[in-house]
Amino acid sequence: MARDYYEILGVSRSADKEELKRAYRRLARKYHPDVNKEPGSEERFKEINRAYEILSDPEMKARFDRFGEAGVSGGAASGFSTDFSDSFADIFESFFSGFGGAGTQGRRRTGPVRGDDLRLDLNLEFIEAIFGGDKELTIKHLETCGTCNGSGAKPGTKPQTCSTCGGTGQVRRATRTPFSSFTQVSVCPSCNGSGQIIEEKCVDCGGRGQKEATKKIKITIPGGVDNGTRLRVSNEGDAGRMGGPPGDLYVFLSVKNHPEFQRDGINIISQIKISYLQAILGCCLEINTVDGKTELTIPSGTQPNAILTLEDKGVPRLGNSVSRGAHLITIEIDIPTKITPEEKELLEKLAKIKGERTGKGGIEGFLGSWFQQK
């Protein structure tokens, strides 16, 4: 089954380089085999690496966008041909050992940390997606604890610098072999990499500095959204740590089907059925549109499956609500299987006027095979 690398990373096809990197970092932390021991986490981790490997390379990304997985199946190995150094430095520093002299050895882990982004899936009614509007959402996210202001320490106290690691969040162990020596770096077991020790924890948050909260927010859905549209709500993700900024909330939209209308880009599509007499003579009918009832003129001589167009009755163009698509109506012509004697008599007269042959079975010309007397 073909894989969608955008879906694996949980981003849209319009995601920029920074969005891809943030999504990759978040997922890599979550599914790294040294952290996540659940079955399937290692395969998921490999999938995430592969997706970022392709989408972070402009050439490979362009090939994937055009041809799908087939366009990149031979273009990169399953290793890391793309430069992951920046991402790995942040993500894996606490998982892998490093050698003496490496640039990450003295890095402190106690600086501000941005909060995680959150995802919310929202299912819209067909008409809501076309015209947009305000929606009230209930979200759950982490907020900075108001009692300790995010420090995790009991009010009146403050975190202390970890004496084991000196506040770096890392410990080093020198190892000698018959051939060389190197320094192994790992997460400080005393402070778990934070560089700080909380001796008296805040009773409200248990020392975490954050509390889960339920919140109602109002967002505006722009007109013209469709399945897969992603809306970003700034600063409504999880709160940051150690004074870091909050993450963002991403709302992924899906649209319910409509019993009468279909959508093709910015055009609305529907079907109506008319009688053969209406098709021949023409008529004016009231039909449904997304704007409500409107009149549609059926020209005389309309053929089966003809498409009539109502301009500016379609979907507003996303980002430019003044510009709208069209409503395309496919005409289906209802041919009766039985007719009354009076109808038959009139049709036979019409057939004679048109020069059609009639016989024992009725009209033998164009209309003959369509009708039977009741």
Curated annotation (Swiss-Prot):
Zn(2+) 1 binds at residues 145, 148, 202, 205. Keywords: Chaperone, Cytoplasm, DNA replication, Metal-binding, Repeat, Stress response, Zinc, Zinc-finger. GO terms for cellular component: cytoplasm. PROSITE patterns: DNAJ_1, DNAJ_2, ZF_CR. CDD domains: DnaJ (cd06257), DnaJ_C (cd10747), DnaJ_zf (cd10719). Transmembrane segments: none annotated. The keyword Cytoplasm applies. Residues 4-68 form the J domain. Zn(2+) 2 binds at residues 162, 165, 188, 191. GO terms for molecular function: ATP binding; heat shock protein binding; unfolded protein binding; zinc ion binding. The keyword Lipoprotein does not apply. Its main location: cytoplasm. A zinc finger (CR-type) spans 132-214. CXXCXGXG motif repeats lie at residues 145-152, 162-169, 188-195, 202-209. GO terms for biological process: chaperone cofactor-dependent protein refolding; DNA replication; protein refolding; response to heat. Binds 2 Zn(2+) ions per monomer. It holds the Pfam family DnaJ. Its cofactor is Zn(2+). Homodimer. Participates actively in the response to hyperosmotic and heat shock by preventing the aggregation of stress-denatured proteins and by disaggregating proteins, also in an autonomous, DnaK-independent fashion. Unfolded proteins bind initially to DnaJ; upon interaction with the DnaJ-bound protein, DnaK hydrolyzes its bound ATP, resulting in the formation of a stable complex. GrpE releases ADP from DnaK; ATP binding to DnaK triggers the release of the substrate protein, thus completing the reaction cycle. HAMAP family: DnaJ (MF_01152). The J domain is necessary and sufficient to stimulate DnaK ATPase activity. Zinc center 1 plays an important role in the autonomous, DnaK-independent chaperone activity of DnaJ. Zinc center 2 is essential for interaction with DnaK and for DnaJ activity. Belongs to the DnaJ family. This is Chaperone protein DnaJ. It comes from Trichodesmium erythraeum (strain IMS101). The lineage of its organism: Bacteria, Bacillati, Cyanobacteriota, Cyanophyceae, Oscillatoriophycideae.
